[in-house]
Swiss-Prot record:
GO biological process terms on file: trans-translation
PANTHER family in the cross-refs: SSRA-BINDING PROTEIN, TMRNA-BINDING COMPONENT OF TRANS-TRANSLATION TAGGING COMPLEX
GO cellular component: cytosol
Subcellular localization, as worded in the UniProt entry: Cytoplasm
Role noted for this protein: Required for rescue of stalled ribosomes mediated by trans-translation. Binds to transfer-messenger RNA (tmRNA), required for stable association of tmRNA with ribosomes. tmRNA and SmpB together mimic tRNA shape, replacing the anticodon stem-loop with SmpB. tmRNA is encoded by the ssrA gene; the 2 termini fold to resemble tRNA(Ala) and it encodes a 'tag peptide', a short internal open reading frame. During trans-translation Ala-aminoacylated tmRNA acts like a tRNA, entering the A-site of stalled ribosomes, displacing the stalled mRNA.
Record gene name: smpB
Annotated protein name in UniProt: SsrA-binding protein
CDD domains named among the record's database cross-references: SmpB (cd09294)
Gene Ontology molecular-function annotations: RNA binding
Any single Pfam family the record assigns to this protein: SmpB
Record's keyword terms, sorted: Cytoplasm, RNA-binding
Coiled-coil region: none
Family under the similarity heading: Belongs to the SmpB family.
Length: 158
């Protein structure tokens, strides 16, 4: 008999839930990260914060700015700077496409998830996004509340 293949295991380290509320997500992309050894060990112990971070282009390269990976406690002298710039690895075609998109006004690159893929590599899901206005945020909240209320009513009255 054929065995069913399970979905790939992705161990999520950090999730930027605030980004989906503050930004309108237009396009997603998976990028690799250039990390030091102590950073990987710190990530494996689920310590990271990408809530206030963003991606920017400098000298034709894509960098993750203001992400926080704390120092690994057992790595005494080989530790890293917790808020250092981290290079993101994407193809040249994707880099050109995202560079052209972010050069338009109001567009930015925000990280959504930081995770280990099925091969054990640290990956970052980044999104091309446009900032929401206050009325857009209120509309999103109303839709979410109505969805919850609708589910409650369906559960109650079948």
């Amino acid at each position: 008999m054929n065995k069913k293949k399970n979905a790939p295991v992705r161990k999520i380290i950090a999730d930027n839930r605030k980004a989906r509320f503050n930004y309108e997500i237009l396009d997603n992309l998976e990028a690799g990260l250039v990390l030091q050894g102590a950073e990987v060990k710190s990530l494996r112990s689920n310590h990271a914060n990408i809530a206030e971070s963003y991606a920017s282009f400098e000298n034709g390269e894509l960098w993750l700015v203001n992400s926080y990976i704390p120092e690994y406690t057992q790595a005494n002298r080989f530790n890293h700077e917790p808020r250092r710039l981290r290079k993101l690895l994407i193809s040249k075609r994707e880099m050109a496409r995202f560079f052209n998109a972010t050069s338009r006004e109001g567009m930015t690159l925000v990280p959504l998830k930081l995770y280990f893929n099925e091969r054990g590599r640290a990956k970052l899901e980044i999104a091309l996004a446009r900032g929401k206005k206050l009325h857009d945020k209120r509309e999103t909240e109303k839709k979410r509340d109505w969805g919850r209320e609708k589910a409650r009513l369906l559960k109650r009255y079948g």
